Design a protein with these regions (language model features):
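Short beta-strand segments
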Residues: 100-102, 123-130, 151, 161, ...
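Short coil/turn connectors at secondary-structure junctions
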Residues: 42-45, 65-69, 90-97, 119-124, ...
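Short gly/pro/ser/thr-enriched loop/turn and capping motifs at secondary-structure boundaries
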Residues: 56, 77-80, 106-108, 131-136, ...
Length: 252
């Protein structure tokens, strides 16, 4: 393994990312921060990163999170089994670890661990980066059909739309909530979130509309509870049913 960050410690509190979502230089960074932040609040404290270009927003979001533990390895297959071991060792009801990979053959390398996770009922979250719809099926570098690549072994799957494409960032938040419910459920196993990203993949500035794209996430950074447990004006907890329905629609 290439290394592990020494400053981030996996704590029991769901600390928000330190950067303001609205001040992110581009929607990729904001969406990735929401996804990693939600996963952490839902119990995913370890993020195993295999370096790659398309997954840059996810890797940087994991590194930015002040309390997440980040493990780095250049071999996706080994990294996935490491994450599987974290999940098996965490005990019943734990969300386990996430694996972050780039697109293409990097994703295919996760299949052995996904099969093992399914057969042993162990939590394993697979966060894979992908090209946006217009680059699929075009012969673009490191592009394969990643939709439902793990077949029936995945207990949950969602193909998440590109940031800034019209769907609000809370769609990614509810997908994170849905995936971790499976990971922590009575019959855990692999959950797969396929994350589409357009350029720029790094922190380069690009015009976007925070007021439109972050609607429904007002106050998110100040909270430590998962997005699904938002509150009505009367203070009673509720499930974000409309967004959960949207996540289910993506998980087809």
């Amino acid at each position: 393994f290439a290394g592990e960050n020494s400053t981030a410690t996996a704590t029991a509190t769901g600390t928000s990312n330190v950067s303001s979502l609205a001040s992110a230089p581009n929607p990729n960074q904001a969406w990735a921060d929401v996804l990693v932040g939600e996963l952490f609040r839902d119990g995913v404290r370890v993020f195993c990163v295999a370096p790659g270009s398309r997954s840059t927003p996810l890797a940087l979001a994991a590194e930015r999170h002040p309390s997440a533990r980040v493990v780095v390895c250049v071999d996706e297959r080994s990294l996935a089994f490491y994450a599987l071991g974290v999940g098996k060792g965490a005990g019943a009801g734990a969300a386990g670890a996430a694996v972050i990979t780039s697109s293409g053959t990097a994703v295919a390398n996760l299949l052995p661990a996904a099969v093992e996770a399914a057969e042993s009922a162990a939590p394993l979250l697979l966060l894979t980066a992908d090209r946006p719809p217009e680059l699929r099926g075009t012969g673009a570098n490191q592009t394969i059909d990643q939709t439902k690549i793990f077949g029936s072994f995945a207990r949950y799957y969602a193909d998440l739309p590109p940031p800034g494409d019209g769907a609000p960032a809370r769609v990614w938040a509810t997908a994170a909530n849905a995936a971790t419910r499976v990971l922590r459920g009575a019959r855990p196993g692999p959950a797969h979130l396929n994350c589409q990203f357009r350029d720029p993949l790094g922190p380069a500035p690009v015009a976007w509309d925070p007021a439109r794209d972050l609607r429904g996430l007002e106050g998110w950074e100040a909270r430590t509870t998962p997005f699904s447990f938002t509150h009505r004006d009367d203070g009673e907890p509720r499930s974000a049913s409309r967004d959960a329905s949207g996540a289910r629609a993506l998980a087809r």
